[in-house]
């Protein structure tokens, strides 16, 4: 029934964001509240990205030391990944998005005139807060259902460059980090 479908979708969303597969069976701007987007989905996006980074740090340390006795503290790696890498980068990318016109507010829908001259109601919300961690953590669950192809989520060429950079920077940094740990 319809009620059980809602619970199934909620369970699926929760589990998929917890394990970083970010399967999204809803359109973010209309399927979730601002609170849920900011304090549940975004939290999972930070935690799942930091979990992958922390696990990789442990693997790199074990390769470098050639022993499993000194791989470090997973929880320390997790907190450092969130507070020293993901959060600062998210703030910088979010600031760029705001400067370029990505919505950041709680105003609801706005009326716009399309290229064809028709008026249409378009959702907006805390998009500039959610997009950076979605991109940095290579998460699939975006604020808008069509993700970065939505004109409000990615309004200019500069936002497109910032979002593409955000997807690539952490995986590329992991390659350099492996070289640092192995001294090569």
What are these regions (language model features)?
Residues 32-106, 157-184:
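A conserved hydrophobic secondary-structure block that centers on an alpha-helix together
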Residues 1, 108-113:
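Helix-loop-helix hairpins and the membrane-proximal interhelical loops
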Residues 12, 52, 60, 64, ...:
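Generic structural signal for short, flexible, solvent-exposed coil/loop and linker residues
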Residues 16-19, 25, 96-97, 101, ...:
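Membrane-embedded translocation segments of transport machinery
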Residues 9-18, 23-31:
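Long, highly hydrophobic alpha-helical transmembrane signal-anchor segments
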Residues 2-7:
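Short, small-residue-biased leader/transition segments that mark boundaries at the very start
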Residues 8-11, 56, 68, 126-129, ...:
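Alpha-helix initiation and N-capping motif
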């Amino acid at each position: 029934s319809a009620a059980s479908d809602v619970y199934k979708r909620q369970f699926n969303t929760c589990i998929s964001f917890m394990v970083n597969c970010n399967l999204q069976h809803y359109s973010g701007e209309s399927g979730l509240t601002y609170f849920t987007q900011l304090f549940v989905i975004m939290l999972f996006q930070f935690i799942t990205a930091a979990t992958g980074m922390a696990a990789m740090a442990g693997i790199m340390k074990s390769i470098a030391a050639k022993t499993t006795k000194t791989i470090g503290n997973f929880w320390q790696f997790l907190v450092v990944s969130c507070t020293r890498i993901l959060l600062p980068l998210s703030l910088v990318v979010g600031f760029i998005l705001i400067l370029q016109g990505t919505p950041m507010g709680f105003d609801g829908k706005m009326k716009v005139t399309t290229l064809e001259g028709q008026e249409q109601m378009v959702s907006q919300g805390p998009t500039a807060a959610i997009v950076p961690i979605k991109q940095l953590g290579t998460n699939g669950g975006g604020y808008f259902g069509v993700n970065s192809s939505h004109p409000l989520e990615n309004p200019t060429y500069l936002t497109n460059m910032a979002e593409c950079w955000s997807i690539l920077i952490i995986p590329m940094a992991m390659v350099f980090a492996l070289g640092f740990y192995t001294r090569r």
